[in-house]
Swiss-Prot record:
<comment type="function">
    <text>This protein produces a dimethylation of the adenine residue at position 2085 in 23S rRNA, resulting in reduced affinity between ribosomes and macrolide-lincosamide-streptogramin B antibiotics.</text>
</comment>
<keyword id="KW-0949">S-adenosyl-L-methionine</keyword>
<feature type="binding site">
    <location>
        <position position="100"/>
    </location>
    <ligand>
        <name>S-adenosyl-L-methionine</name>
    </ligand>
</feature>
<protein>
    <recommendedName>
        <fullName>rRNA adenine N-6-methyltransferase</fullName>
        <ecNumber>2.1.1.184</ecNumber>
    </recommendedName>
</protein>
<keyword id="KW-0808">Transferase</keyword>
<dbReference type="InterPro" id="IPR029063">
    <property type="entry name" value="SAM-dependent_MTases_sf"/>
</dbReference>
<comment type="similarity">
    <text>Belongs to the class I-like SAM-binding methyltransferase superfamily. rRNA adenine N(6)-methyltransferase family.</text>
</comment>
<dbReference type="Pfam" id="PF00398">
    <property type="entry name" value="RrnaAD"/>
</dbReference>
<dbReference type="GO" id="GO:0005829">
    <property type="term" value="C:cytosol"/>
</dbReference>
<dbReference type="GO" id="GO:0003723">
    <property type="term" value="F:RNA binding"/>
</dbReference>
<dbReference type="InterPro" id="IPR001737">
    <property type="entry name" value="KsgA/Erm"/>
</dbReference>
<keyword id="KW-0694">RNA-binding</keyword>
<dbReference type="GO" id="GO:0000179">
    <property type="term" value="F:rRNA (adenine-N6,N6-)-dimethyltransferase activity"/>
</dbReference>
<feature type="binding site">
    <location>
        <position position="12"/>
    </location>
    <ligand>
        <name>S-adenosyl-L-methionine</name>
    </ligand>
</feature>
<dbReference type="InterPro" id="IPR023165">
    <property type="entry name" value="rRNA_Ade_diMease-like_C"/>
</dbReference>
<keyword id="KW-0046">Antibiotic resistance</keyword>
<keyword id="KW-0614">Plasmid</keyword>
Length: 245
């Protein structure tokens, strides 16, 4: 088995917990599902029972061979031996994504599924602290994700639910796609704005007078309690001051 910590995995083995997760997914028999990490096929098997088709992507050769043998007679399951970060999700097909992602790749994978897929709903099992970071609009990741998806916790999963037992608790979260808050034509400007904003490099974005106007328009009294909506307002002021709107 691949022992590389970059791809280390902690497996859900409790039938009770797996069933609790399935209940939260709200999948229909017409749904197409892409699963990140087949593992030993426990969740894959349950996904296939309640959806139309499951495509499960697994990098680890040992786990891929193990799950291939276990699921070889299941006509609803297609297994792919590939790194999820290299996988190309379909552009036109309707689908949902489910996965328990390695802690060490959480940021890369969540960016992948949000910005490089068209999934309507994304269900991920992640480390609890990472989930909190996705909600933090004082961080780059939070400000980028919120433009495309809303994020909510569905289920708390204590470390005891996994084998081997990790040092941290996990949560099942749902990312629901919404109409983008930042049109494609402004995306590069937004990522630049965010990189400067989170590092408080305000002088790189505004003159002193512009900054004062942007804060006033967004009704910001305290930068430490600024909301996502206020950041969007400030970004729109940035576009206006730079003749982009």
């Amino acid at each position: 088995m691949n022992k590389n910590i970059k791809y280390s995995q902690n497996f859900l083995t409790s039938e009770k917990v797996l069933n609790q997760i399935i209940k939260q997914l709200n999948l229909k028999e017409t749904d197409t599902v892409y699963e990140i990490g087949t593992g030993k096929g426990h969740l894959t098997t349950k996904l296939a029972k309640i959806s139309k088709q499951v495509t499960s992507i697994e990098l680890d050769s040992h786990l891929f061979n193990l799950s291939s043998e276990k699921l070889k007679l299941n006509t609803r399951v297609t297994l792919i031996h590939q790194d999820i970060l290299q996988f190309q999700f379909p552009n036109k097909q309707r689908y949902k994504i489910v996965g328990s992602i390695p802690y060490h790749l959480s940021t890369q994978i969540i960016k992948k599924v949000v910005f490089e897929s068209h999934a309507s709903d994304i269900y991920l099992i992640v480390e609890e602290g990472f989930y909190k970071r996705t909600l933090d609009i004082h961080r780059t990741l939070g400000l980028l994700l919120h433009t495309q998806v809303s994020i909510q916790q569905l289920l708390k999963l204590p470390a005891e639910c996994f084998h081997p037992k990790p040092k941290v608790n996990s949560v099942l979260i749902k990312l629901t796609r919404h109409t983008t808050d930042v049109p494609d034509k402004y995306w590069k400007l937004y990522t630049y704005f965010v990189s400067k904003w989170v590092n408080r490099e305000y002088r790189q974005l505004f003159t002193k007078n512009q900054f004062h106007q942007a804060m006033k328009h967004a009704k910001v009294n305290n930068l430490s309690t600024v909301t996502y909506e206020q950041v969007l307002s400030i970004f729109n002021s940035y576009l206006l001051f730079n003749g982009r709107k």
